[in-house]
Each structure stands twice: as structure tokens, then as C-alpha cells.
């Protein structure tokens, strides 16, 4: 996957383009957006989640139930369950799933949510609740 602003990204991109061609590259990008749509729709259609971003992006930002996103992501990592990032915007923290792996299919995306939910529900007494930002 490409990083932001790294010098060798141009070489990676050129090599990928030469290997798969323009149509192949388009297919990879389309697939990445399809997997982000699968994840976003899962979050939107599940009342236990709060979605923080809509639109055309590979990042899906959300919270699960009332759990603190930073702590949930950290504990998932230390428990060797998932490695997922968290982010913040305007004082709100959220889980930030980036669907940048072209090998992932729908089953991997759904498995991600299954693992997150199972871990959070089994460890709910050990996880902090998130603080809600009060807007004046």
C-alpha cells in the first residue's frame, strides 16, 4: 500500500502500473473502494456503531458502542487480535479502519468486525467508556 509523501512511492506506483497496466490499476483501486463501502455499510446498518465519515474514502471512521476508541485499538493490538488505528477530529476519537489491502475480500472485512465485537463484548468491564464532547 502507498504511504503519504514517501519518496519511493513514485517508484512503487510506476512498478505496479507497469506490472498490471492501466486497467489492472483501475481494477485494484475499484476493489479497494468496494471493500471500504462494505465496511461503511456494515457500520451504518448496525445500531451498535457510530459512523464518523461518509463519502468516497478508503478510511472508515467509527466507534463501537460506548467504548473508548484509543483504548479499544490499543488493547486489541496487545491481545494480538487486530491491528487497527484510531484517530481524532474536533475532539472526537474514533476507530479508523483503512481498507488499503487489495487482497481483502468481503469475508475479511466482516471478520474484522466480528473479532472487534467479540473482543469488546467479552472485555467490556476492562474497557474505558468514551467521554462525549459537550458542545456549548
Task: Show the residue positions of the predicted features.
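Catalytic pocket-lining loop regions of alpha/beta-barrel enzymes
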Residues: 10
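Conserved C-terminal alpha-helix-loop-beta "cap" of PLP-dependent enzymes
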Residues: 1-6, 17, 21-133
Amino acid at each position: 500500500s502507498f504511504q503519504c509523501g514517501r519518496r519511493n512511492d513514485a517508484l512503487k506506483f510506476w512498478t505496479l502500473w507497469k506490472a498490471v497496466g492501466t486497467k489492472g490499476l483501475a481494477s485494484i483501486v475499484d476493489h479497494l473502494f468496494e471493500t471500504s463501502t462494505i465496511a461503511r455499510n456494515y457500520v451504518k446498518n448496525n445500531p451498535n456503531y457510530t459512523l464518523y465519515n461518509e463519502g468516497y474514502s478508503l478510511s472508515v471512521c467509527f466507534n463501537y458502542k460506548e467504548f473508548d476508541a484509543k483504548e479499544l485499538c490499543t488493547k486489541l493490538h496487545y491481545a494480538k487480535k487486530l491491528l487497527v488505528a484510531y484517530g481524532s477530529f474536533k475532539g472526537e476519537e474514533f476507530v479508523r479502519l483503512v481498507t488499503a489491502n487489495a487482497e481483502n475480500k468481503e469475508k475479511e472485512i466482516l471478520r474484522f468486525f466480528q473479532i472487534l465485537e467479540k473482543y469488546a463484548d467479552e472485555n467490556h468491564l476492562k474497557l474505558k467508556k468514551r467521554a462525549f464532547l459537550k458542545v456549548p
